Regions:
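ATP-binding Walker
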Residues: 22
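Hydrophobic anchor at the beta1->P-loop junction of P-loop NTPases
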Residues: 16
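P-loop (Walker A) phosphate-binding loop of NTP-binding proteins
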Residues: 19
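Walker A/P-loop
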Residues: 25
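A glycine- and Lys/Arg-enriched "phosphate-lid" helix/loop adjacent to the NTP-binding pocket
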Residues: 102-145
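Short glycine-rich anion-binding loops that position phosphate/pyrophosphate groups of nucleotides
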Residues: 87-90, 112-114, 160
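NTP-dependent small-molecule kinase module
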Residues: 2-11, 30, 34, 144-177
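ATP-dependent small-molecule kinase phosphotransfer cores
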Residues: 42-90, 94-98, 137
């Protein structure tokens, strides 16, 4: 196998990033099925490793402790031919994001603040951790810069139904093949 084939094979994963409620898991499952790839939700891997729900982990070790666990689980994930849906806060985990850039194509599912706010009635119930004095708008603005920094492909889903977003993703992936 030549070097190009090895590189191409290593980068055959798709990693979906974006705000909570943007549809990373929903879109990811369908895209994985259509492309014949495995689907991995890293929040479930974290819960499995820690034997606790995410909110219990955060309550126990705090936001920084959770980010350490999230970084470790995402950084250590070794897989091929998969669609990976990490939690929205993975963009704070530099080692994990560098790993994802090496093993796949990072797809940013982008939606406006208004769209996300409409989908998430209560950020706290959704498990979104806000720092003292931080608003959901602040969190959105902070993360958008990171999503844009790491994205190989950006899919704007404002005004789209889920099926339209899936089609946009598949079209972009086809262009890259």
């Amino acid at each position: 196998m030549n070097l190009w084939s090895k590189i191409h094979m290593k980068k055959n994963n798709l990693i979906f990033i974006g705000m909570p409620a943007v549809g990373k898991s929903t879109v990811g499952v369908v895209v994985a099925k259509r492309l014949g790839k495995n689907f991995i939700d890293t929040d479930l891997l974290i819960q499995e490793q820690e034997k606790k729900l995410l909110r219990e982990i955060i309550a126990e070790v705090g936001e920084d402790g959770f980010l350490e666990i999230e970084n470790q689980v995402n950084r250590d994930l070794e897989t091929e031919n998969a669609v990976i849906s990490p939690g929205g806060s993975v963009v704070y985990c530099e080692e994990a994001m560098q790993h994802y850039k090496e093993i796949g194509t990072v797809v940013y599912l982008q939606a406006s603040y208004q769209t996300i706010k409409r989908r998430i009635k209560s950020p706290k119930k959704r498990g979104v951790v806000l720092r003292e004095g931080q608003t959901f708008q602040d969190l959105y603005n902070e993360r958008v810069r990171l999503f844009e920094r790491y994205a190989d492909v950006t899919i704007c889903e404002d005004g789209c139904q889920i099926e339209e977003t899936i089609e946009k993703v598949l079209e972009e992936i086809e262009k890259m093949a």
